[in-house]
Amino acid sequence: MVQVVENRSRVRGRVMNVAQHPTMDGYAVVDLALSDVAPVSGYANLFGHETGKVVSVNIPWGDARSHGLMPGDDLSAVVRRAGPQAVFADPASLAKG
């Protein structure tokens, strides 16, 4: 089993794709091309070397829809890595534009 240290990062990037998550009901997968990554005080920053990469971020489907997320949009959020391939956004931190 892989253990992940408690972590948070503030990211900004361009939405490349939005789709329903293939296995997690109620979630969207947003592919985000990261243009900026900043630490969140008190947490490890596991995204410090991810600038310029595309990261798949899990966002509750209702939040993705309420923000009208579409490819080409700019998005910022606080994210956490929950496993090697699992990244989740804090819905309260989502900001489009």
PLM-predicted stretches and their roles:
Residues 1-3, 20, 67:
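Outer-membrane beta-barrel proteins
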Residues 3-13, 49, 73:
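Short coil-to-beta-strand transition motifs
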Residues 6-38:
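Structural detector for short beta-strands of small beta-barrel domains
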Residues 11, 55-59:
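Generic detection of short hydrophobic beta-strand segments and adjacent strand-loop junctions
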Residues 19-22, 79-83:
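Short, low-complexity Ser/Thr-rich regulatory SLiMs
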Residues 26-56:
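OB-fold (S1/OB) nucleic-acid-binding surfaces
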Residues 34-37, 81-97:
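OB-fold/S1-family single-stranded nucleic acid-binding modules
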Residues 49-52, 61-77:
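Short nucleic-acid-contacting surface segments enriched for D/E, G, S/T with interspersed K/R
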